Amino acid sequence: MASVYLDSCMVIGLIEGDATQRQLLKKQLVKHVIYSSELVRLEVRLLAVRNDNRESLQKFERFFTACEMIDLNRAVFEQATLLRAKTNLKTPDALHLAAAIHSCCQELWTDDKQLKTTATHYLEVVDWPTLDSMK
């Protein structure tokens, strides 16, 4: 099974997206080991916490419980620093990419344009149009 790091937009699509997005992601993810990080957890839960949406929070927690969680340790931050210096990625995006690389993920699923452009130099990138073509 291939290993995949899902960035925040993909996790939100999986949990709170429209029915088509959710089905498409679920169908493709069964073939993968899913990696995530506390950074993704922070980003995706923000609105649910702000709105006290307990149902969404429970769905997110079930998702993260099923993931391999990447420790954002000093080595990941060092790699993120180098990526940010070389590519001018935003700090969170540099951390997402560094986490995926550090964990030897084969794929990064994102729809962030700048992150996609940079990540293609390091691993396979899957975005919404790519997922849509896999139907």
Explain the meaning of each model-derived region.
Residues 1-3, 101-135:
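Acidic, PIN/NYN-like endoribonuclease modules and their adjacent C-terminal/linker elements
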Residues 1-36, 47-59, 131-135:
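Short, well-structured N-terminal submotif of metal-dependent ribonuclease cores
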Residues 11-12, 41, 77, 115-116, ...:
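A generic structural signal for short hydrophobic patches within well-formed alpha-helices
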Residues 30-32, 63-67, 86:
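Structured helix-beta-strand junction loops
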Residues 35, 70, 126-129:
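General small-molecule cofactor/ligand-binding pocket signal
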Residues 45, 61-64, 81:
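Amphipathic alpha-helical segments within well-ordered protein domains
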Residues 51-55, 87, 124-128:
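Short, hinge-like loop/turn segments at secondary-structure boundaries
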Residues 68-117:
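Active-site neighborhoods of divalent-metal-dependent phosphate/nucleic-acid chemistry enzymes
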